[in-house]
């Protein structure tokens, strides 16, 4: 098991569209284990593979109080079951210390595979529905701050930079930024 570096906003790799998982291999199962460990270590409730620079359609989450009931969703598809959207305050491991309200459908159908390749087809609501939609956004290159005003996006970017500088000074593992092309 290994802790994986979590990409931070505005890293352009977070905008990469994830590709479907073709088969649940030993490598995928190892990634799932590492993602769950990383999510718990970061005190999160959900993590998409895109956030740890693996651009495949894979989500892990655990909404239990004891953090002992991880769920895995491979190649997830979500269908809203209600038209009305409700605001929920969201945060994100890729946008540390930034929280804001995002409106999403409160009830959805989730179709996916679990870590053993078994089909999942459930109707979910509340926090689980919101969490699944939030993590699915990551698989599509969308970050929750994209739903906010430009001013709030700028503030979020500035806050993340400050948080990362503090974390680096404290010796925490921070994902390296993608190399920038050299100026010619």
UniProtKB/Swiss-Prot annotation:
Cofactors, names only: Fe(2+)
Catalysed reaction equations from the record: N-terminal N-formyl-L-methionyl-[peptide] + H2O = N-terminal L-methionyl-[peptide] + formate
Keywords noted in UniProt: Hydrolase, Iron, Metal-binding, Protein biosynthesis
Enzyme class: hydrolase
Residues forming the catalytic site: 135
InterPro entries attached to this UniProt entry: Peptide_deformylase, Peptide_deformylase_sf
Gene Ontology process terms (BP): co-translational protein modification; translation
Name of the protein this chain belongs to: Peptide deformylase
Biological source species: Psychrobacter cryohalolentis (strain ATCC BAA-1226 / DSM 17306 / VKM B-2378 / K5)
Gene: def
């Amino acid at each position: 098991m290994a802790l994986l570096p979590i990409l931070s906003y505005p890293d352009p790799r977070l905008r990469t569209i994830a590709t479907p998982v073709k088969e649940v291999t030993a490598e995928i199962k190892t990634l799932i284990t590492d993602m769950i460990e990383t999510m718990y270590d970061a005190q999160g409730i959900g993590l998409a593979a895109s956030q740890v620079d693996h651009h495949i359609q894979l989500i892990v989450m655990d909404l239990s109080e004891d953090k002992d009931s991880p769920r895995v969703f491979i190649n997830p598809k979500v269908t809203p079951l209600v038209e009305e959207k409700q605001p929920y305050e969201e945060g994100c491991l890729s946008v540390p210390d930034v929280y804001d309200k995002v409106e999403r459908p409160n009830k959805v159908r989730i179709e996916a595979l679990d870590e053993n390749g078994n089909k999942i087809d459930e109707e979910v609501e509340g926090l689980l529905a919101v969490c699944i939609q939030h993590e699915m956004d990551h698989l599509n290159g969308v970050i929750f701050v994209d739903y906010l005003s430009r001013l709030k996006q700028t503030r979020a970017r500035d806050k993340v930079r400050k948080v990362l500088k503090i974390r680096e000074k404290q010796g925490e593992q921070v994902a390296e930024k993608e190399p920038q092309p050299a100026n010619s």
